[in-house]
């Protein structure tokens, strides 16, 4: 039977999720989520869920308390915690509600809000992959896979059958023959593979604010793509004058400085793709973020590299240029020159945090 | 059938319950039959979320409340030990996880509440069959949901709840307004009045100043003006300002029948719960007084002592920025009992200036017990504090008043002076700490606008909430709505016309 309260609670749950949806832009634009990555759910503070009343504000308010203290001594901020002062401990204080959401739910909301199309995998859409599933039982195997319940059940059966079982002294000792082990079957599943390569400029002209914007955007793009593909592989590249492949954690934390040579990142990306992701089998996405302040002579090198190696094999090549107080912002002009030729090249200029939301839509709105 | 989870008390508890009940009766407590049930925390939270009532209409805020209670419990921030509802018979729910000493304490505490519900004057008008009433409300609400859809009704409930505190908590006890005249009656009366006004008599011109003397005409004209003024006062609607805004809306707002019914349900339930808000300090104080009396004299075993002391002191804990109603209530009752036992009251005592004599004043009157029973019968929190709070008590209890300092956004200790503390306490308690708001005019500017007035007592309204509330008020009144209040120390009218908000300083009359 459904309890009355469950129904009311579910309704409440729906309402707060609706609130999150309304304010999604705020959550997307601020990088609060990133630290929580890796957990299954994220907690999001949702203020103002309560019903408004005519009620007293702080101005002119006060109350009566008990305890030591001199006149003029502060007794704590009024807002936020527990019962509000001035109400003789009766009125409920203001609570910030936290709603628990999975990242998938958030990704769906994002998709809905930005009207992102489902991504259609290119090429052979029914690639198969093999997966092991522990679904069967067999009489041999390593101890770590021993199925205790089955083992003891068999032992009990044997002891009863051989009249060795005494219910008053219920000892069960399995023998080798009684042991049973979990076992796997290898199943083949249709699978769409996607490889995503994130490139970030970490040179001196990229300030912490810019990096923060890049990370926030990369996080949401990643969350969305994860939702779209069963198996998604990610690689991370950071570069200044030279490029390094780094792990995800480093990508989200690193601080660097130095000059800028974008082509180094492209070479690294090309290298990774050749090494790990044969383009015939993978949907490949590249997301590059920079303030566009490249070392001048490097630009032609970059374009050449892109035309030769990356454009031909990528589903999408997305370049996001973050506005920086120091960078020249010239690089995007170079790409604009070839924009017409390649319909998988997408450009976006990100002025500030508020622009992240729109930029995500620019990148992912094509549905490729 | 209403209480679906009903499980009789296990033998061990039912023995304790009978023992505690007997103690309570021996001390002269007088209560309705009290039915105890043991619930686990989930069930108890569920009941608590519904205000103690197992059957109520569906609404998300009950779910929100439940969510909060369960979370608070799992994080170890709070715990409900019991819950009692004011009905006849009384229902009391005990937490199954309480240990045996807790159960004793809680049962004794419950009998205190039950006695209070039955005997305190402020509860005398509450519906003791509220279980049935709540279930009826649920049925009516569900019918509206069937007819109009869940979300439509839910949204309207939200709107009504936004106004639920705008009731008159004294309305069951006082008749405030005369019967309102119907429109037909007004017309008949004003027609008659307008005909009766005189004028010049016909007269030849040379006789005119004798037949129609100037002064008399003047006088008549002035009377006529006076009548007209009175008449326009009668057109003012409502004639006197009305405290129960919600009731006013039920009567006069242009609502559909089902909406009027929803608003009526919200109004009736708010009125039912109002006395609990008016007597929080007394009610909790009274229940605590009895659990501590019964437990310390009869209920304690050696092994239960520590648990009792722990639980009791937890309940009595004080904090600087929040007054504990349990603590204030029990201490004040104890103080009254002692004073009336020793005769520390009346003019002779009040006027005594010898501090030593005053402190050791003891006439051995033994009137204390009788006195506190009288107190629990007739007082609410405000009259209780107003009558019995003394400077000695404030000093002993280390009480102080605090105030919000706008410059550093902090609450600060303001004073330890008796008069200030008392005044602040009474202010905080007035109308349960909520602003007092009246319907001043329902035909404001002669355009059917609603004009409310906030009775400003030094604390300003929270502006953003006030604006949101005006929007809800507009949903019901369907014409522009206004509230007169004080913003930044200036009399101000906040208005909402259905599209936009405006804030105007009140022009001087």
Protein language model regions, located:
Chain B
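Post-HExxH zinc-binding segment in Zn-dependent metallohydrolases
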Residues: 117-185, 284, 288-301, 314-325
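Extended, Lys/Arg-enriched charged tracts that mediate electrostatic binding to polyanionic substrates
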Residues: 43-70, 173-203, 218-219, 224-227, ...
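Non-catalytic terminal regions of proteins
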Residues: 101, 224-227, 304-509
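Active-site His/Glu-centered metal-binding helix of metallohydrolases
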Residues: 107-116, 290
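Auxiliary, metal-adjacent structural segments of Zn-dependent hydrolase domains
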Residues: 3, 11-90, 213, 217-253, ...
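Short pre-active-site segment immediately N-terminal to the catalytic Zn-binding motif
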Residues: 69, 89-106, 274-282
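Long, internal scaffold/assembly segments composed of regular secondary structure
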Residues: 230-330
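Fold-level signature of zinc-dependent metallopeptidase catalytic domains
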Residues: 5-9, 94-97, 117, 123, ...
């Amino acid at each position: 039977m459904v309890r009355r309260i469950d129904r009311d609670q579910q309704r409440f749950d729906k309402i707060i999720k609706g609130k999150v949806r309304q304010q999604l832009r705020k959550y997307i634009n601020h990088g609060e989520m990133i630290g929580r990555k890796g957990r299954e759910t994220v907690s999001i503070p949702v203020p103002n869920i309560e019903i408004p009343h005519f009620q007293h504000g702080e101005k002119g308010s006060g109350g009566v308390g008990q305890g030591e203290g001199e006149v003029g001594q502060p007794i704590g901020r009024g807002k936020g915690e527990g019962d509000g002062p001035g109400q003789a401990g009766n009125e409920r204080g203001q609570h910030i509600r936290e709603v628990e959401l999975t990242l998938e739910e958030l990704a769906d909301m994002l998709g809905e809000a930005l009207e992102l199309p489902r991504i259609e995998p290119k090429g052979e859409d029914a690639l198969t992959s093999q997966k092991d599933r522990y679904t069967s039982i067999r009489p041999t195997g390593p101890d770590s896979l021993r199925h205790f319940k089955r083992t003891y059940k068999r032992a009990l059966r044997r002891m009863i059958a051989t009249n060795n079982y005494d219910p008053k002294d219920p000892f069960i000792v399995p023998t080798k023959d009684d042991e049973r082990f979990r076992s796997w079957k290898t199943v083949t599943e249709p699978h769409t593979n996607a490889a995503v390569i994130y490139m970030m400029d970490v040179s001196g002209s990229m300030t912490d604010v810019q990096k923060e914007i890049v990370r926030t955007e990369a996080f949401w793009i990643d969350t969305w793509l994860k939702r779209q593909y069963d198996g998604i592989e990610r690689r991370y590249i950071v570069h200044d004058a030279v490029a390094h492949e780094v792990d995800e954690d480093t990508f989200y934390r690193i601080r660097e400085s130095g000059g800028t040579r974008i082509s180094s990142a492209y070479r690294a990306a090309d290298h990774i793709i050749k090494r790990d992701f044969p383009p015939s089998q993978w949907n490949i996405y590249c997301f590059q973020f920079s303030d566009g302040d490249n070392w001048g002579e490097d630009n032609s090198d970059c374009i050449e590299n892109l035309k030769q190696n990356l454009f031909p094999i990528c589903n999408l090549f997305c370049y996001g240029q973050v506005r920086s107080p120091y960078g020249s912002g010239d690089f995007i002009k170079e790409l604009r020159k070839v924009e017409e030729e390649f319909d998988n090249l997408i450009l976006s200029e990100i002025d500030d945090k508020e622009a992240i939301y729109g930029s995500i839509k620019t990148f992912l709105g094509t549905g490729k | 059938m209403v209480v679906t989870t009903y499980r009789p008390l296990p033998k061990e508890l039912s023995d304790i319950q009978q023992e505690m009940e007997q103690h309570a009766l021996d001390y002269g407590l007088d209560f309705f039959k009290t039915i105890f049930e043991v619930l686990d925390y989930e069930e108890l939270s569920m009941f608590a979320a519904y205000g103690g009532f197992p059957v109520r209409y569906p609404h998300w805020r009950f779910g929100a409340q439940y969510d909060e209670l369960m979370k608070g419990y799992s994080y170890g921030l709070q715990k409900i030990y019991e819950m009692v509802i004011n009905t006849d018979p009384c229902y009391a729910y005990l937490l199954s996880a309480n240990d045996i000493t807790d159960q004793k304490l809680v049962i004794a505490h419950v009998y205190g509440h039950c006695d209070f519900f039955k005997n305190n004057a402020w509860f005398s008008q509450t519906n003791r069959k509220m279980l049935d009433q709540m279930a009826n409300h649920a049925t009516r609400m569900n019918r509206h949901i069937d007819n109009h859809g869940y979300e439509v009704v839910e949204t309207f409930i939200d709107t009504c709840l936004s106004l639920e505190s705008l009731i008159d908590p004294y309305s069951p006890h006082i008749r405030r307004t005369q019967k309102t005249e119907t429109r037909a009656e007004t017309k008949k009366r004003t027609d008659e009045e307008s005909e009766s006004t005189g004028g010049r008599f016909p007269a030849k011109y040379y006789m005119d100043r004798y037949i129609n003397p100037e002064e008399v005409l003047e006088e008549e004209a002035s009377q006529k003006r006076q009548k007209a003024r009175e008449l326009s006062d009668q057109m003012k609607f409502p004639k006197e300002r009305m405290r129960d805004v919600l009731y006013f809306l039920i009567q006069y707002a242009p609502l559909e029948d089902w909406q009027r019914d929803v608003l009526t349900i919200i109004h009736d339930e708010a009125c039912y719960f109002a006395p609990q808000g008016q007597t929080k300090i007394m009610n909790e104080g009274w229940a605590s007084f009895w659990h501590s009396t019964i437990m310390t004299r009869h209920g304690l075993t050696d092994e239960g002592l520590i648990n009792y002391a722990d639980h009791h002191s937890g309940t009595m804990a004080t904090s600087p920025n929040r007054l504990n109603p349990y603590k204030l209530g029990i201490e004040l009752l104890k103080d009254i009992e002692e004073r009336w036992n020793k005769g520390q009251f009346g003019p002779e005592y009040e006027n005594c200036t010898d501090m030593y004599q005053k402190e050791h004043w003891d006439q051995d009157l033994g009137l204390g017990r009788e006195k506190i029973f009288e107190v629990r019968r007739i007082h609410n929190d405000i009259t209780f504090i107003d009558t019995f709070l003394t400077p000695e008590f404030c000093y002993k209890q280390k009480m102080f008043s605090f105030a919000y300092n706008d410059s550093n956004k902090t609450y600060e200790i303001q004073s330890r002076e008796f008069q200030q503390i008392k005044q602040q306490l009474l202010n905080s308690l007035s109308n349960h700490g909520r602003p007092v708001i009246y319907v001043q005019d329902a035909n404001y500017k002669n355009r059917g606008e609603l004009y409310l007035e906030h009775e400003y007592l030094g604390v300003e309204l929270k502006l953003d909430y006030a604006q949101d509330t005006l929007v809800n008020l507009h949903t019901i009144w369907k014409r522009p709505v206004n509230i007169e209040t004080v913003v930044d120390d200036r009399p101000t009218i906040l208005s909402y016309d259905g599209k936009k908000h405006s804030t105007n300083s009140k022009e001087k009359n």
